[in-house]
Regions:
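N-terminal single-pass transmembrane signal-anchor helix
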Residues: 26-61, 71
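Intrinsically disordered, low-complexity sequence elements enriched in Ser/Thr/Gly/Pro
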Residues: 3, 21-22, 26, 55, ...
């Protein structure tokens, strides 16, 4: 056993013992200032990202709206193949009477074109429920007329109900003509009351002639031929009481041409160009639009 020696080698050694203050420093959380900075940064990021997310969603809704019109266009063209003409814009059944020795529909504003193409929109069952010898608002057509048809609704319209007066709403109207350059409301479009229009009746060309367009004003029903209109205003500029080309999309509206093509037209489109596009026989030359 060796001699005892003093532990001089530990004389200058300092033991690192954490005090309560050191432990508090190591475990310290966010200060209020730091928390506010983080919240501010998150707010800025959300503010930057939210418009982009909303724009992406609207782009998707606009595409879905265009797809609706594409379906309607195929239905109209198939109807034309079967009947050698597009459907009449509307037929008045209620006021059918003998005029000058012939049966006439003197005020054709009741059963709509959009009711006649139902079989071509995979709605044959609904088509069989309709009584085409009765008016749109007759008791016989009340149940069928209340059906909501998704192909007739723009996903951007934002309405809380898809019914108007108890009948299914539509956001798409047929083109009767234009009052931009012709104030007397001539029937120079493709959707007329009591008169079916053939492709041969469109000398301006089907690819240059609009047949259906968005009209998201609240009063339109797919069974009621009040869903045809003449164009009198620039796109998205008509007052609420006027049926015209109006959408809930920013900057323009979706339109369907008689060849089945769908075009998103800017609300900045010159009204004279718009007037040329909605007439079937104006003889105008239209460039890019």
């Amino acid at each position: 056993m060796g001699a005892w020696r003093p532990m001089n080698h530990l004389k200058n050694t300092t033991l690192a013992v954490k005090t309560p203050a050191c432990r508090r420093a190591a475990c310290r959380g966010f200060t209020l200032v730091e928390l506010l900075v983080v919240i501010a940064i998150l707010g800025i990021l959300i503010g930057l990202l939210l418009p982009a997310v909303q724009a992406a969603r609207e782009a998707g809704r606009r595409m879905s709206c265009g797809n609706n019109l594409h379906q309607i266009g195929l239905a109209l063209l198939t109807f034309h193949d079967d009947h050698q003409a597009f459907p009449q814009g509307g037929i008045e059944v209620r006021l059918l009477r003998l005029l000058n020795g012939k049966l006439r529909y003197p005020n054709g504003r009741q059963l709509a074109w959009s009711a006649y193409i139902l079989p071509y929109l995979e709605e044959k069952g609904l088509d069989r429920q309709l009584d085409f010898t009765k008016a749109f608002d007759s008791p016989e057509n009340a149940q069928a007329g209340a059906r909501v048809i998704r192909a007739y609704l723009c996903p951007s319209d934002g309405y809380s109900s898809n019914l108007v007066g108890g009948l299914g709403r539509t956001d798409y109207g047929g083109i009767y003509g234009q009052r931009i350059t012709c104030a007397n409301n001539p029937p120079n479009g493709c959707m007329l009351y009591d008169r079916p229009i053939r492709i041969l009746d469109i000398p301006d060309g089907t690819s240059h002639t609009m047949i259906v367009a968005e009209d998201t004003h609240t009063d339109m029903q797919w069974i009621n031929a009040l869903n045809i209109f003449d164009v009198s205003c620039a796109i998205n500029s008509a007052p609420p009481i006027e049926n015209d080309i109006v959408s809930k999309h920013p900057g323009g509206a979706n339109t369907l041409f008689a060849d089945g093509s769908v075009h998103y037209l800017s609300e900045r489109l010159d009204v004279k160009v718009l007037a040329a596009l909605v007439t079937r026989n104006g003889g105008e030359t239209v460039g890019d639009y």
